[in-house]
Amino acid sequence: MNTIITMLCGVAFMCIPLGCHAQADGWKLVWHDEFDTEGAPDKTVWHFEKGFVRNHEDQWYQEDNAYCHGGLLVFEGRAEKRPNPMWRKDSREWRSSRDSIRYTSSSINTRGTFQFLYGRMEVRARIPVTGGAWPAIWLLGTGVEWPSCGEIDIMEYYRIDGVPHILANAAWGNDKRYDAVWNSVRTPFSHFLDKDPLWASKFHVWRMDWDREYIRIFLDGELLNELRMADIRNGSIGNYGNPFDKPQYILLNLAMGGDNGGEIDDASLPIRYEVDYVRVYQKEGL
């Protein structure tokens, strides 16, 4: 089976020249964003999520908090208080029951502009590690509701019972709507600090290798999680198929608080999540 890349013609320039950044082991660069243009991320490539979106998170997503500067894509998590335009009196729905916005951040994705099936994805980034920070690099499928669409979390950082962790996960569906089967590896942040006490001040490379047999997630070359494709099957909602046999699109976001982020350390705000590049490679006949 040949690899699949799906792009709108308007973003084809993102892949030129393909020869740059080639890797010695036969991987060919097929898509990338180096974030070299000052200002907003390219809106022909990246779509913004807006408002309160998921996981009971505390931040309001808006466009102002993501921008390119000095060759980096910067997400800023800020303390900003203003009325919630979605507020409804007596509402029990979490998005509309909050009368105010207290924090803002950004979330962007390539849904409808770029998706890929199999390959290597690399992201070089520096993440915030303060209380309440929940940065992520992840992928989602389309065509069926979550989690049967499949989710790959190349990177998540948050605190579990107060202890900072870096996570590498995948999720798919079962027979119950909106209920996921998770394969999650949670590595205590101390594992990385023991090797480098200055880890949090530096950029690091997250990598996913994805083919017909395995999904492998790495951090600075260290294997964090390995999933066998043969072990992954949706339930009845996903027609018992493997969601990772279909293309996925890219998401980058900085969440704050919510179900997993924990208590936000207001004294540390604003916080920054910085992305140097996103690159996708493929091999012929992968």
Please state what every model-predicted region is.
Residues 1-24:
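Bacterial Sec-dependent N-terminal signal peptides
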Residues 23-286:
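GH16 jelly-roll
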